[in-house]
């Protein structure tokens, strides 16, 4: 009888520990989603403010050239839409999100120079760093002690100074930078929301 009680106690403690970990992971997931949503909103505001200050002829020029431009994230293999994202594993979505955020470590410093508001510039750098750290913890949680077999996570992106070496003029370069930042934050928000929704196992979870 005593042995049965001990075993029951061990099982209950284990369940409580696992529930605690699950709760912590869910809070972290919710936190990273909120952070990337804020970054996406910030990116949208920045590009709108930039556009509002353009001269009509500059706006017409950019409308013709920017759709043909590439972002450094185009070198990162990723789902092209929500449907494809929903078919990807949670770990894959987290890894791609990490890679996308990582691609802005250098570019965010360049991005900060295009923003006149120093508070906004600081917010970008801090939130990108926090987001990268949070996603890294979630990836480790998904691996659950298993080795990370995705060697591509540690490979440098091609053309790390991509946004510095383009032959665009300053106006086009700045607009491209803002447009790419908005596009990438939209991607990360989509991937993290899909991953979080899948993890919650909530049938009412909406994307």
Swiss-Prot record:
GO BP, one annotated term: positive regulation of receptor signaling pathway via JAK-STAT
Taxonomic superkingdom: Eukaryota
Signal peptide: 1-22
A GO-annotated cellular component: extracellular space
Metal-binding is among the record's keywords: yes
List of residues binding Zn(2+): 38, 189
Cross-referenced SUPFAM superfamilies: 4-helical cytokines
Listed Pfam families: Hormone_1
InterPro entries: 4_helix_cytokine-like_core (IPR009079), Somatotropin (IPR034975), Somatotropin/Prolactin (IPR001400), Somatotropin_CS (IPR018116)
Keywords (A to Z) from UniProt: Disulfide bond, Hormone, Metal-binding, Secreted, Signal, Zinc
Record-annotated disulphide pairs: 71-180, 197-205
GO molecular function, one term: growth hormone receptor binding
Subcellular location: Secreted
Known role: Growth hormone plays an important role in growth control and is involved in the regulation of several anabolic processes. Implicated as an osmoregulatory substance important for seawater adaptation.
Family: Belongs to the somatotropin/prolactin family.
Protein name: Somatotropin
Species whose genome carries this gene: Labeo rohita (Indian major carp)
């Amino acid at each position: 009888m005593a042995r049965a009680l001990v075993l029951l106690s061990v099982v209950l403690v284990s369940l409580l520990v696992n529930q605690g970990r699950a709760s912590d992971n869910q809070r972290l997931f919710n936190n990273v989603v909120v952070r990337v949503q804020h970054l996406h909103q910030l990116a949208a505001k920045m590009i709108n403010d930039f556009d509002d200050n353009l001269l009509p002829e500059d706006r017409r020029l950019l409308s013709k050239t920017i759709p043909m431009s590439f972002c450094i994230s185009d070198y990162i293999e990723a789902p092209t839409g929500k449907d494809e994202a929903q078919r990807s594993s949670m770990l894959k979505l987290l890894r791609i999100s990490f890679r996308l955020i990582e691609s802005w470590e250098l570019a965010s410093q360049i991005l900060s120079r295009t923003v006149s508001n120093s508070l906004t510039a600081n917010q970008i750098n801090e939130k990108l760093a926090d987001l990268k750290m949070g996603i890294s913890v979630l990836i480790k949680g998904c691996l659950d002690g298993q080795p990370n077999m995705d060697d591509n996570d540690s490979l440098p992106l091609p053309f790390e100074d991509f946004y510095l070496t383009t032959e665009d003029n300053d106006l086009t370069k700045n607009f491209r930078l803002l447009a790419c930042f908005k596009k990438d934050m939209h991607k990360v928000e989509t991937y993290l929301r899909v991953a979080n929704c899948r993890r919650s196992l909530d049938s009412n979870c909406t994307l």
